[in-house]
From Swiss-Prot:
Homodimer. Part of the ribosomal stalk of the 50S ribosomal subunit. Forms a multimeric L10(L12)X complex, where L10 forms an elongated spine to which 2 to 4 L12 dimers bind in a sequential fashion. Binds GTP-bound translation factors. It comes from Xanthomonas campestris pv. campestris (strain ATCC 33913 / DSM 3586 / NCPPB 528 / LMG 568 / P 25). GO terms for biological process: translation. It comes from the Bacteria. CDD domains: Ribosomal_L7_L12 (cd00387). One of its GO terms (molecular function) is structural constituent of ribosome. Keywords: Ribonucleoprotein, Ribosomal protein. Belongs to the bacterial ribosomal protein bL12 family. GO terms for cellular component: cytosolic large ribosomal subunit. Forms part of the ribosomal stalk which helps the ribosome interact with GTP-bound translation factors. Is thus essential for accurate translation. This is Large ribosomal subunit protein bL12. InterPro entries: Ribosomal_bL12 (IPR000206), Ribosomal_bL12_C (IPR013823), Ribosomal_bL12_C/ClpS-like (IPR014719), Ribosomal_bL12_oligo (IPR008932), Ribosomal_bL12_oligo_N_sf (IPR036235). Pfam families: Ribosomal_L12, Ribosomal_L12_N.
């Protein structure tokens, strides 16, 4: 008896963020693939135009000394539940992807005020 795609998606939806991250890592190792988006090689031309980055990723690098404040800030930024926010705070990782520069700076300020260290990429 094999599972349908819908059953697999439902099972994944019930998992916590940390469990899903572990699942992705296991799939990468099992099948020898990477979940990272492929990087397209830029055409080397004399008139290469450098575009300003419009989408940013905010990454939590350290929760700082006050973990409780950092967890509260992570919950406020991501909308995650308490357990998922705690797991993300302890493990570090991506808080938000594809946000504007203003939004990224706002998140960075909020997290820094909570004592956490974040990086905007």
């Amino acid at each position: 008896m094999s599972l349908t795609n819908e059953q697999i998606v439902d099972a994944i939806a019930e998992k916590s963020l940390m469990e899903v991250m572990e699942l992705v890592k296991a799939i990468e190792e099992k099948f020898g693939v990477s979940a990272a988006a492929p990087v397209a090689a830029a055409a080397a031309g004399p008139a290469a135009v450098v575009e300003e980055q419009t989408e940013f990723t905010v990454v939590l690098t350290s929760p700082g000394a006050n973990k409780v404040a950092a967890i509260k800030a992570v919950r406020g930024v991501t909308g995650l539940g308490l357990k998922e926010a705690k797991d993300l705070t302890e493990a570090g990782g991506i808080l938000k992807e594809g946000v504007s520069k203003d939004e990224a700076e706002k998140i960075k300020k909020e997290m820094t005020e909570a004592g956490a260290t974040v990086e905007v990429k």
